[in-house]
Each structure stands twice: as structure tokens, then as C-alpha cells.
């Protein structure tokens, strides 16, 4: 009878070890996925910052052209 109990205990211990091993593998996969997603977020942030700088530059150019156009229109009205 004690051999039966020992075998059941051994089976439960083995099952626990298998479960722990699977969970460790899953944790590693999730860590890799998390690192990958973190890198994607960082890349997206850099792209956003670059686009914001470009947008500001284009707005400045647009304002410059609008000022020139207003000046030309003002000269045309004077004539």
C-alpha cells in the first residue's frame, strides 16, 4: 500500500514538474514577445517624433509662403 501511495505521489510530483516546465517556457515566450512589442513601441515613438518635427517644419514653410503671398497681394492692390 505504501508503494501505491509513493507511486501516486511520484506521479503528482512529475505532473507538477511538467507543469512548471511548461509555464517557464510560456514565460520565456511572453518575455520575448514583450521585448519585441517594447521595441515596436519605441520605434513608433521615434517615427511619431520625426513626423511631428517634419509637420512643424512644413507648417513653418506654409506660414512663410502665406506671408509672401499676402505681401504680393498687397502690392497688387497698390497698383
From Swiss-Prot:
Subcellular location: Cytoplasm
Signal peptide: none
GO cellular component: cytoplasm
Record-linked InterPro entries: Cell_div_ZapB
Biased composition (Polar residues): 35-45
Modification N6-acetyllysine occurs at: 8
GO biological process, one term: FtsZ-dependent cytokinesis
Region Disordered, annotated ranges: 34-65
Coiled coil: 3-79
Compositionally biased tracts (Basic and acidic residues): 46-60
This protein's record includes keyword Acyltransferase: no
Key words of the record: Acetylation, Cell cycle, Cell division, Coiled coil, Cytoplasm, Septation
NCBIfam families: PRK15422.1
Family indicated by similarity: Belongs to the ZapB family.
Self-association state and partner proteins as the record states: Homodimer. The ends of the coiled-coil dimer bind to each other, forming polymers. Interacts with FtsZ.
Free-text function comment from the UniProt entry: Non-essential, abundant cell division factor that is required for proper Z-ring formation. It is recruited early to the divisome by direct interaction with FtsZ, stimulating Z-ring assembly and thereby promoting cell division earlier in the cell cycle. Its recruitment to the Z-ring requires functional FtsA or ZipA.
Name listed for the protein in its UniProt record: Cell division protein ZapB
Amino acid at each position: 500500500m505504501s508503494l501505491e501511495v509513493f507511486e501516486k505521489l511520484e506521479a503528482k510530483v512529475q505532473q507538477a514538474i511538467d507543469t512548471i516546465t511548461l509555464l517557464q517556457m510560456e514565460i520565456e515566450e511572453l518575455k520575448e514577445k514583450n521585448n519585441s512589442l517594447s521595441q515596436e513601441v519605441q520605434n513608433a515613438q521615434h517615427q511619431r517624433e520625426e513626423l511631428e518635427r517634419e509637420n512643424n517644419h512644413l507648417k513653418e514653410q506654409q506660414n512663410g509662403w502665406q506671408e509672401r503671398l499676402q505681401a504680393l497681394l498687397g502690392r497688387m492692390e497698390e497698383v
